[in-house]
């Protein structure tokens, strides 16, 4: 099956980057940032000349999705987005640290790619300094963001004992691979230290700058509109989207009150919502006694949905999802990468049982694991979109959030977890737009968010600065989920009707697509989108 197309062949040939999406690595990320100007020139030639002859090109007419991507990327805002998007939350150092801090990744092919191209790590400080020190972007940042750079540029290495414990390689190979690990680690640490010096130097400029409003607001509304479309693959009325977010939040609060009273008789209908959240969070039945109990709980839920979706409903399974338990204070709580669902237990005492079903449905089956492996095994029809751009986030993360509502035989506590996660994604819409489009401050948004979430205050602050540094991305979950709801009509969902699941399977095979084309394909009336 053809896993590529003309445009991807041109780009990978000229930029000398990996063409197999399974082998994309941080090295390709570095090459992409470094060669951005060359990339734009390639797209420009491809855009204006249907007969563009290239050594790797088989001359075919461009399709509508390719045209949309190329025209969108050639807008001047895309270059600004590359520079501002390479920040403390999203940068090559973080990508490398994920590999070097995780013993499970050292035997993966991407580690070999990193070792082979290890000298390219020396280019990261120059590339990153250029991105964050542009004088026109000074007000995009504040001292807090620069300090957060320093907090993530760190290097807690793993030991040979930790690696040996999980490796499937022979003893001799383990010794050889770990020698390579030490070589890469030394280069990585040296460059982290060099970049930290640059950050500290630049941070001094913010000492006397009391910049409370950060983000796109300083650059302009047109730029934020571009960022939002870059993650959704569709242009929406931002003020309508914000209004809908507030309406959805009220609906979810009302629903949470109903289910909270079902699980705790001491909760009353007129109780302050923050007190309800405290009672739910501190309910002893939802706490774990040990990491072992937590691990078994997750494994059982993964097994449950594997039996339902793979064995009973005949969803495709190309690989079984692996649950990888690890502990690292600098990495996120849970995420999926190719075949692995990584679960960070660093803060396990604050993790709750009622969130497990939603997280498993989102990250594994029928969520990201099912969607990604279906995509890889059936051939990505528009691989260049998946490879270089965020424009598929609406589809991919929307499918993940939509999957959270596809549970079976759930308890009231499971429903509470689903409501909490949907409320969380709804708040993202409100906060992201308020920060970047209406000039609200992170402090204002913190005071707003904390009244609706079970997470601790430091995690909420981390979330807000994530939105500052990656405008539009956080909106993609809820908007994408709404598209799938409109297609499948979740309000009339019948869990025993196999036709519903046949449509789910078809949607996975159709994608991933920018939401604009998914909406057109299924004839969704955009005027009724926010109802």
Q: PLM ranges: what are they?
A:
Residues 1-531:
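N-terminal maturation segment of proteins
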